[in-house]
From Swiss-Prot:
GO molecular function, one term: tRNA (guanine(46)-N7)-methyltransferase activity
Name by which UniProt lists this protein: tRNA (guanine-N(7)-)-methyltransferase
UniProt: S-adenosyl-L-methionine binding residues: E43, E68, D95, D117
Gene3D superfamilies in the cross-refs: Vaccinia Virus protein VP39 (3.40.50.150)
Enzyme class: transferase
Keywords: Methyltransferase, S-adenosyl-L-methionine, Transferase, tRNA processing
Domain of life: Bacteria
Active site: D117
Source organism (scientific name): Brevibacillus brevis (strain 47 / JCM 6285 / NBRC 100599)
Amino acid sequence: MRLRNIPGAEAALREYPTFVDNPLFYKGNWKERFGNNNPIHVEIGCGKGRFINTLAERHPDINFIAVELKAEVVLRAVQRTEYKAIPNLAFVQYDASKLTELFADHEISRIYLNFSDPWPKTRHAKRRLTYKSFLNTYRQVLVADGELHMKTDNENLFEFSLNQFAAERFQMRNITFDLHQSKLAADNVMTEYEERFSSRGQRIYRVEASCVIK
């Protein structure tokens, strides 16, 4: 579903304390933004913001950053914060293909990919967030034992991703082809999209992958 254009969205974002207007300033120094040395977890694509907000509330000892390209999407997500300054949560409007401009080498402990665009046409494979070029970027910004957690409702994207992880020497675990019927469901935080589609009987696929520093 296409999100309608919201006039003035970029200006409106600056009214929210969780939005970071100058993210490049913090590259290598996100600890200054959060005021601590806690691990950093990044969600690429934030949807309506439920997932990242819930994690921030449950884990005050972890810093969370949502990276999203479209201002309208970020605005909808930050509105969940109701203008509150949540100390361990930040939203950034930026292109995820340029993560190395936002983060220094090995600055992130975990990356979340939730229901990313599957780009089903073969000629668009390079745009998939689990394509090898993206995985190499993740490896660069993740710590040595950093993790990538992926969820999708698209079986073809999931199988493609598993193959990419294997080819790029990511170590996989907790692979499930039906998340909500697995033991992993108990600790699962659902996105709005996930809740809607799983309620219709759609299976959710999930995997955790750890990078090996080359």
